[in-house]
Amino acid sequence: MTKSTWHQGELIEVAIADLSDTGDGVGRFAERVVFVPDTVPGDRVLVRLLHVKPNYAHGKLHQLLEPSPHRIRPGCIVADKCGGCQWQHIDYEYQLIAKRHQVIQALQRIGGFAQPPVDPVLVTASSLGYRNKATYPLDVSATGQVQAGYYQKGSHHVVNLNQCPVQDPRLNPLLAQVKQDIQQRDWPIYDEKRHQGQIRHLGLRIGRRTGEILLTLVVKDGNLPGIEQQAQEWLQRYPQLVGVSLNRNPERTNAIFGRETRCIAGVPYLREIFAGLEFQVRPDTFFQVFTETAEALLQVIESQLNLQGHETLIDAYCGIGTLTLPLSKQVRQAIGLELQPEAVQQAIVNAQHNGINNVEFQVGAVEKLLPKMGIIPDVVLLDPPRKGCDRIVIESLLASKPARIVYVSCKVATLARDLKLLCTDGTYTIQRIQSADFFPQTSHVEVAAFLVLSQSGKDN
C-alpha cells in the first residue's frame, strides 16, 4: 500500500516498536507513524485505522497476531475497557524501562540534553493496590441501576466497578455499599448532557498509614433528602470512616470538585503520617496518590541536598506543605508559596500541629510572589502543575541565582522545556535526574531534577 492510499477504516498490519508519552503503542506503516492503544513493543498486530492524517494515524487494535514477550494478562477484568489504566497489559519491569526511556527522550528531544543523567525509576511497594484516593463518576444503566467506576477509554461512558485493583483495597467495600444505598434512597444521578440530577461523583480517600477514610459526594446543589441520616449510618457501619462531606459543583464543567465543601458527619479531614509528620488531608486537598513512593522521593531529595541547617529554602507551589514541612526541619528558614488560600490554611495548621515554627507560607501566584521575595535563597524547590513554570518564574530564578534548584514535575515535556531555559548559557548544570513511579499501570511518571549553579553562572 502506498502512502497515498491509506484510508480511515482500513486494516493494516503493524509491528509495534515503541510507546508514546500518552501510553499508546507506536509502529510504522508506509513510512508513517501509527499510534495504537493496548499494544506493547514487540507486538505484531492488525490495526483498524480510525483517524488518518498525512503523516500519522491513530488506530484500534483489531487482532493480536503475535504477542510481545512483555505482554501479560491484566490483573483487572475490565482493563480493556476502562480508561483508568493504560498499561495493565504490560509487564511491570518493562513499564519501568519505558518510563525511563520516556524521560530520556523528552530531555534529549525537547531539552536538547545529549546525555541526561537519568537514574533508574524509583519504586517502593506493590504496583497494585497503591492509590490512596479514588474519584468515581456516577451513571445509571439502561435498567436503572446506579453505576460508579471510571470512564471508558475515549468516552464519558462509565465502566461499572465494585472494586479496582489499583486502589487501596480497604476502599472497595465502601464503593459497592454506597452505590447500593444511593439506589435504595432513589437519589437522582447527575446527567451531564441535560445538566439535571444531583450526584456527580463519589470520592474516597484513605490515610495509608492511619487507615482513616473520607467519603465525599460531589453534587449539583445538595438536595438529597435524608443525606445526614445516611452519612451517620455510614460512619456507624465503617469504623475506619471518619468523615462524610458534600462538595457542591453546580456548573456545566468537566472539573470534578466545586468550590464549596461541607462536612455533614464526622470530621472534615483524615490524618496521614508522611515523613514522620502528621498531616490533615481534606477531600479536595492535593496529596500524592502513592504515599510510599512520594515519601521515597522525598528521601532522595533530602539525601541529594544534604542540608546543613543554615540554609533558606523556598518551596514554590507548596500545597499543604507536604515537602515544605519535612525539609523545614533541616534548614534555618523555609518559605512556602501557594496560589490556593485553602491549601495555605491547611499548611499552617499542619505546621502548628507538628510544632514547626521556622516556616512561613504566602498566598499568591508563584510568578508574582517569587520576583518580589527580596532574598536569595540557598535552595528553591519547584513542584508546578502539569503546565510547568511560568516564564517569569524561570527569569526570576536566572536573576536571583539560588545555589541549588530541585524541580519536581508530573509532565516530563514541560520539565524538559523549563530545564533548557534554566541551563541556557551554562547558568545551571543538571546534577542528577530521578524519576519515580507514582502511577504504576499508567504511562505517567514523576521526575525530580537536581540543578546546581555553575561557576559561569556565579561569575555572570
From Swiss-Prot:
GO molecular function: 4 iron, 4 sulfur cluster binding; metal ion binding; rRNA (uridine-C5-)-methyltransferase activity
Signal peptide: none
Protein residues bound to S-adenosyl-L-methionine: Q288, Y317, E338, D383
GO biological-process terms attached to the record: rRNA base methylation
Keywords from the UniProt entry: 4Fe-4S, Iron, Iron-sulfur, Metal-binding, Methyltransferase, S-adenosyl-L-methionine, Transferase
Residues annotated for [4Fe-4S] cluster binding in this entry: C76, C82, C85, C164
Domain of life: Bacteria
Enzyme class: transferase
Pfam families: Methyltransf_31, TRAM
Domain annotation TRAM: ranges: 5-63
E.C. numbers: 2.1.1.-
Keyword S-adenosyl-L-methionine: yes
The keyword Methyltransferase is annotated on this UniProt entry: yes
Active-site residues annotated for this sequence: C410 (nucleophile)
Family per similarity comment: Belongs to the class I-like SAM-binding methyltransferase superfamily. RNA M5U methyltransferase family.
NCBIfam families: rumA
Record-given protein name: Uncharacterized RNA methyltransferase alr3654
Native source species: Nostoc sp. (strain PCC 7120 / SAG 25.82 / UTEX 2576)
Lineage: Bacteria, Bacillati, Cyanobacteriota, Cyanophyceae, Nostocales
